[in-house]
């Protein structure tokens, strides 16, 4: 029940994550100690009969037996003593015994000297007192605890939600004031997992562990004293609330240890004196807490949080093949799939989607196994096949040439239907050197495959690394152009696949947060690593004008990170001494072992600084000024585009389903089908759309029934396959009928003409093809403009202007919708990417106009935006009296929706789907009367099948996402 209450208490705040750890009781004192200088033990250290914990490893005792079911977990029996190295995994901790290391379930162990009145094994409160008096008795058991706290340092007051006591910011229990006037200000560092190592000074500064460490409940040692507890009349004692450890900042740890390098790095939380009001401080504190859950190198960020979140853009390709077969290769990788001729029946197609997932699941790496390739996700659209397919790739390891190694370790392909496993071995069809081929039978809609080097008979202290030559890839990422101050990211991969782009999210105190920045791969280098060990990565510049920050010149990647195959990301800041003399230069990256021996080094030439004419203001305008329109230059990709011919022919790749229920709707909707039990409906795809029905959110298929395209509830359909049943009645679905049906909602969408005009001028290379698609065939250019136009973008704009005049002409009896005619023409030109950009902009703008004054309610449903952030969206649009006019309320709504859509990502389907769900959650949702957003969902989810049917495979190349 305590867990349910805390989840309810936190439901309006930031989501909980694994790093928050266990739940604790405020009635117990605890010291938040940190994991500093965590070290991986050597085999000899593990063989000692009575081992001593190394570094700050925490000793625990097993309370029940555990028998592992995979390579990465550690076997132990009740009463065994274990030493925990890392607890950031939440339910799984990384620990070692006297012989080996591995993951253990946190609920199966408890610390030594553990008091059963604080925590149970599962992180829930055990034997919780029933009254505040019992809490007082519990606190009195600590003996001199209340005296010790008087001598301790000042509690850090960086939590804006408590005056004097740092605890859950979303609760307002009474707290005992701190001794701010008696003690100097100290610093709190939040510690995170998966960071690089950086030096930091520990004088009077204290550290607060954000990983939710159960060991922080143990008595303090080495001069670390406990802080003053909260008052016993706290209302949350009476309600027996429990809190996550990362939400508690009540106590402070002090240490006189000398400065050390740690696997974890620090992030200073904002201080109250930096802000003018408590609300500003609250917003900054929330941003800081959000950052602390996801960043990889916190010490870089300091008081001004900078680039905190890095994510590799996983390489992905989608390709459609017919019965003649072919090959599909992931761009910039050596991973490909070969499809034999006759794989599918003539007239049918097979759509293959491949993605390289860079971080392997934990099950694939242990002492006896190591992953030597990325996890490859393969998705197939058609399972009615007659042949197998072949996966071919190069791996990052080779078995050593001696007979013993070849007999001990083999390269093995593992397959699973889920990314996290379990994985089952499948035989290799071909293996020579670092090239392997795998024959894939029993095809599934989604498969995950990985190559590992595995030796099931390896005995401790040997590991699989002793029998292979494993290559490690080091990549250096940076901005497209260098600037007076910029950041680079060094990544270490356990395989050959280094993506061309790395996304970096800059977390700031301003709202809204900026869109992610894409860093380019400047260069990469491979070297053979003999064993998983600590690696020190150093960076130097060859020019005196550029300096790598001195405290960032060396960072550490821990050995067990290498063993687990995780991608390591280290951020280095580079600063120019003279910003007026910018030029490209060379960066040298060194990788050293723990003995400071150079394992490898390589140099990378940086890009040039941006040309002066290319420097633009940071704020992005919605549309161009009039004098800028003529300066638009077409992209070279657009210039070479050839527009295919739209074919009006039957849509063949349909699936059919039998209707299990008769549905007649009281409230008629263009987008929800009515149907009879026993009839047959054609399904455009088996992808499901989520939206609210009469009472609750349901899942729907896009169906075609009796000449209408609409949604049908998935529970009312039994999918029977691709064979067309004889009972199917109604007109045949052709591409022109499908196009007309799905474009129905377009005429109800709002648009900004200047924005549409700019977008088309930038992306359409032929005014002639554009005019023909709009129905202005064989008309000369003079029909659209009087003066002679020099550039192609201006000619495209003149055709668009003519379309606008015709659609808005009141004398025209057959008035058409500008939006519908434009989208139809672009789809006939096979400009699907341009269409989805327009549709998403239309949807966001229309939603902003429809929601208007209720946009704050929508913002709370979509992103749980705070009141201060909402005020920040409205502030640019306030008048002299500080009020936003009701007719201008769409502007802050539109600004918010644009920012929110960038945070969702590049998937236009996800943006519109999540927007629909958010609108459905509102009180008296606008989707009840304005149902055209549902039609837009049908539109964007039908584009693929329309494109596949309207254009032959020879008309367009494979497209890469």
Swiss-Prot record:
- Presence of the UniProt keyword DNA-binding in the record: no
One Pfam family, short name please?
A: SH3BP4_C
Q: Name one GO biological process term.
A: negative regulation of cell population proliferation
Does the UniProt entry include the keyword Membrane? yes
Positions bearing Phosphoserine:
131, 244, 249, 277, 294, 635
GO molecular function terms noted in the UniProt entry: GDP-dissociation inhibitor activity; identical protein binding; small GTPase binding
Alphabetically sorted, this entry's keywords are: Coated pit, Cytoplasmic vesicle, Endocytosis, Membrane, Nucleus, Phosphoprotein, Repeat, SH3 domain
Q: What is the protein's known function? A: May function in transferrin receptor internalization at the plasma membrane through a cargo-specific control of clathrin-mediated endocytosis. Alternatively, may act as a negative regulator of the amino acid-induced TOR signaling by inhibiting the formation of active Rag GTPase complexes. Preferentially binds inactive Rag GTPase complexes and prevents their interaction with the mTORC1 complex inhibiting its relocalization to lysosomes and its activation. Thereby, may indirectly regulate cell growth, proliferation and autophagy.
Q: What is this protein called?
A: SH3 domain-binding protein 4
Query: Which gene underlies this protein?
Result: Sh3bp4
